[in-house]
Structure formats: C-alpha cells, structure tokens
Amino acid sequence: MSTTTQNRLESRYGGITITGTPHALSVWTIIALRFVMGGMILLAGLGKYAFVPGGDSFDAFGYLSNVHGASPVSGIYATMAESAVLLDVINVIIPLTQVLIGVALITGAFVRLAAFGGALQMLMFYLGGWEGEWLALFDSTLVYAVVFVALGAFAAGRIGGLDAYIEQIRVRGEPLIERYPKLRYLLG
C-alpha cells in the first residue's frame, strides 16, 4: 500500500487562508468514520421498529413531554407531544430517517444530504436533552452532530462511496454533476 500521495486542504474565508496536508491514509479514516456513523444511526433506527429482533416500538411522547424547562426547545417539544397527529408523524419520521441516513452513509450515496439530516437530528436531540448546565454543554450528541457535518464537508461519499459514480452518470451527454451543479450540495 502506497502512502506517498499527498492530500492538500485549503480554505479561504473572511480574508484568512488555512492550508493543511493530511496523511494519505486519512481517506481510510474518513471511510471508517462514514461506516461507523452510518452503522450507529442505522442500528438506532432499526431498534425503533418492533418487527426487528430486539427492537421496540418507538414512541417519542416520553422524550418530547419530559424535556427540561431550561432547554431552549422545551416549549415546542411539549406542544409536539400534545398533538396526536404530529406525534404520529414524528414516530414515523425519526426511525425512518435514521435508517435512510445509515444506509446512505454506509453506501456512500447522497452523503451530504444524509450528513445534513444526521446533524440536524442530533442537534434537535442535543437541544432537547440540555438541562441548562454548562458542564453538560459538550455531550456525545453534539459530537455526533459535528461528525456528521465533517462527513459532509469532507465529501465522504466521493471517497470509496457511490457518490463518486452517481456524479458521473451521463445525462444528455454530460456528467450529472455538470448538468445539474446544485446536486453538489446533496452528493459528495
């Protein structure tokens, strides 16, 4: 295995340029991170279905109705818990999106969309779990959200994933990503 290929990262923002040269093996770390996060959220989603061995029927009522008053989302979560229709929708959306995010990350397809969805879901869990203590400001849910953002930023789907192939599908003689450049925000 050759590790002589050098990667280069560069970003300019607000007049500041930051550059870096990560080790060539960093691509394997990104793939591993994509698989681990994909597996984690896939199993979390599957565990919310009663038909899965070891799974249990998911009900968000207990979580939404017991958010600590210091949480910035306590009011909106309590309102969600009071609406039977909205609660039914949430009970379907959370496990379904977790399964879809997991599959997307593991296969490397639509990784940026999946990473955004994962980060958003973790941020909502983080805000719902915060009880106002500053020592609990940085917990595992926030770390998960940041890792999802990193996977999207690194375009982890282009590294050993299906996004590298999806982007090159030819549509009317040109690669999909060139024909529809806005797809760069979903793929990668």
Language-model regions, residue ranges each:
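Extended, low-polarity transmembrane helix blocks
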Residues: 1-100, 107-188
